[in-house]
């Protein structure tokens, strides 16, 4: 009796266990069904002729471990652990290319991503099929930060073409790619030289002074002014900008692309990124406001003045113009942030490689002495007579590749690339780092060797496969400015100083810090005046 009675609920007991178990069972059944349907969908995608790649997991795809806490990531993906925690994603993707081929794919959730790892596939996609491969992916994190405006992240189409055409022609008007910009760069170097001399023979980090100088050249074009290196607001904005680019690829921030409201979480990198955005926005909008108040239609001083005048002209012609103060803000942000960070890191890599290779540095010094001397300021007209110096800069760019995965592209329609089916809306990553370390193109690709850019007569070789600024319709708009800054600033630095690592210091890590750009790890140098 007792045993039988024990199987029945006692009198007055609330029988709630059964319904709860049914609810849990139903939820598990739905989850299992979702996983099964997702698995079937992924199998159909793989069977549709897309490029090969690692087997995705249901719901999360291949890189779902990025959404997990670090201690849970081990052995999650392909049983190999989180290798991207110790190497940059560009390096890890290059390793995957050895397994799956130069065109391979993976999934982030349901999002198909195709990686192009050799020059031929990148050229075919970005040049020969430029109209198809020139769009930008719609990602919530980028959309929140840029409102899909500006130049770098805006969608490819008539509005983007119009804005880019105006921006490029206006920058050229103020000296982009012309000798008229030289005096501004040389003038800025005088401040760099003075700052470096303050340290005497003591070790120091070259990052702040180089960042200030490069940013000021952008400021002279866009804002019509330079900022003193001691300006607290300017220094704060540069620090925020550098930090923002570094954390934008923080694995937790990827959650925003799945749940956009995560951007507003009051902790961690979410809170930090919002503060960075607020400070940079305030800085740039104040500058635009000052220009609106002082605008002289007969005497435009800089890019902002020209844009404001053009905006008014367009509004007078028609109501539906795409030129407005909001779009100006995002274009200025693109020029200021992208233009500062990439060139700053390129120059820092140059100083690091010179410090590690005194023999190369000596040859650069000798060529400068022979062509320019120690008293005259360098000029772009000297480039043709300085092939070794130019080759040295190019070799640093090849090895450092400050934008290793370019900016992601997206297909605007279904297409075929080297026999593989590429669906509409596919994210495309050109692995520029992989191209510039390709042993098929570059002999001993990991060695620092400026001579690879010189012919038997010591003259500069123009190599088609050297594409640090990308190729196609989305090629970096600031390429000409960056080349001017790199040459004039690097030659000025080499003309004035000899750079070395502090005595007894360890060799810096040369893999770089992976973010939206590949920055060198913090390092110190000593300088001796020449």
UniProtKB/Swiss-Prot annotation:
Query: What does the record say about tissue specificity?
Result: Specifically expressed in thymus and brain. In brain, expressed in cortex, cerebellum, olfactory bulbs, pons and medulla and the limbic structures (at protein level).
Where, by residue number, does the polypeptide cross the bilayer? 21-41, 99-119, 247-267, 328-348, 481-501
Q: Which GO terms describe its cellular component?
A: cytoplasm; endoplasmic reticulum membrane; intracellular membrane-bounded organelle; mitochondrial inner membrane
Entry EC number(s)? 1.14.14.80
Q: Which cofactor does it need?
A: heme
* GO BP annotation list: omega-hydroxylase P450 pathway; organic acid metabolic process; xenobiotic metabolic process
PROSITE patterns linked: CYTOCHROME_P450 (PS00086)
Q: Where in the cell is it found?
A: Endoplasmic reticulum membrane; Microsome membrane; Mitochondrion inner membrane
Main site of residence? Answer: endoplasmic reticulum
Q: How does it sit in the membrane?
A: Multi-pass membrane protein
User: What protein family is recorded?
Assistant: Belongs to the cytochrome P450 family.
What does the UniProt record say this protein does? A cytochrome P450 monooxygenase involved in the metabolism of arachidonic acid and its conjugates. Mechanistically, uses molecular oxygen inserting one oxygen atom into a substrate, and reducing the second into a water molecule, with two electrons provided by NADPH via cytochrome P450 reductase (CPR; NADPH-ferrihemoprotein reductase). Acts as an omega and omega-1 hydroxylase for arachidonic acid and possibly for other long chain fatty acids. May modulate the arachidonic acid signaling pathway and play a role in other fatty acid signaling processes.
Descriptive protein name? Cytochrome P450 2U1
Q: Which gene encodes it?
A: Cyp2u1
């Amino acid at each position: 009796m007792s045993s039988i009675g024990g199987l029945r609920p006692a009198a007055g007991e609330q029988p709630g266990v059964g319904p709860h178990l049914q609810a849990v069972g139903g939820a598990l059944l739905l989850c299992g069904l979702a996983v099964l349907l997702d698995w079937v969908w992924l199998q159909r995608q793989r069977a549709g002729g897309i490029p090969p790649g690692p087997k995705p997991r249901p719901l999360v795809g291949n890189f779902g471990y990025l959404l997990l806490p670090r201690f849970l990531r081990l052995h999650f993906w392909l049983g190999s652990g989180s290798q991207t925690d110790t190497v940059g994603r560009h390096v890890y993707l290059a390793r995957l290319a050895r397994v799956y081929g130069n065109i391979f794919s993976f999934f982030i959730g349901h999002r198909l991503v195709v990686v192009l790892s050799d020059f031929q596939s990148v050229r075919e996609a970005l040049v020969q099929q430029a109209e198809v491969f020139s769009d930008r992916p719609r990602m919530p994190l980028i959309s929140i930060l840029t409102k899909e405006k500006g130049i770098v992240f805006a969608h490819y189409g008539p509005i983007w073409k119009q804005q880019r055409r105006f921006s490029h022609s206006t920058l050229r008007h103020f000296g982009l790619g012309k000798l008229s910009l030289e005096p501004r760069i040389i003038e800025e170097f005088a401040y760099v030289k003075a700052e470096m001399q303050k340290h005497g023979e003591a070790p120091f980090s070259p990052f702040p002074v180089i960042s200030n100088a490069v940013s000021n050249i952008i400021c002279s074009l866009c804002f019509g002014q330079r900022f003193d290196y001691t300006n607290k607001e300017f220094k704060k904005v540069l620090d925020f900008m550098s930090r923002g680019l570094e954390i934008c690829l923080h694995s937790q921030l990827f959650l925003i692309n799945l749940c956009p409201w995560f951007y507003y979480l009051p902790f961690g990198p979410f809170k930090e990124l919002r503060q960075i955005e607020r400070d940079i926005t305030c800085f740039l909008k104040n500058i635009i406001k000052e220009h609106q108040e002082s605008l002289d239609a007969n005497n435009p001083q800089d890019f902002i003045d020209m844009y404001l005048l053009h905006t008014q002209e367009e509004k007078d012609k028609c109501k539906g113009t795409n030129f407005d103060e909001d779009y100006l803000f995002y274009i200025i942000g693109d020029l200021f942030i992208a233009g500062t960070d990439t060139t700053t890191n390129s120059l820092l890599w140059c100083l690091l490689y010179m410090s590690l290779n005194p023999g190369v540095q000596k040859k650069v010094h000798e060529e400068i002495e022979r062509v320019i001397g120690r008293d005259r300021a360098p000029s772009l007209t000297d480039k043709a007579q300085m092939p070794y110096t130019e080759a040295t800069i190019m070799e640093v760019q090849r090895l450092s590749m400050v934008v290793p995965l370019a900016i992601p592209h997206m297909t605007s329609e279904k297409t075929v690339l080297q026999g593989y089916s590429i669906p509409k809306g596919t994210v495309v990553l050109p692995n520029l780092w992989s191209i510039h370390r390709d042993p098929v193109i570059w002999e001993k690709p990991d060695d620092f060797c400026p001579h690879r850019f010189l012919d038997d007569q010591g003259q500069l070789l123009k190599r088609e496969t050297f594409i640090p600024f990308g190729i196609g319709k989305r090629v970096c708009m600031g390429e000409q400015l960056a080349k001017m800054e790199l040459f004039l600033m690097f030659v000025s630095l080499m003309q004035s100083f000899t750079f070395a690592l502090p005595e007894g210091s360890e060799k810096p890590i040369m893999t770089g810090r992976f973010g939206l750009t590949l920055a060198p790890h913090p390092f110190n140098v000593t300088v001796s005046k020449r």
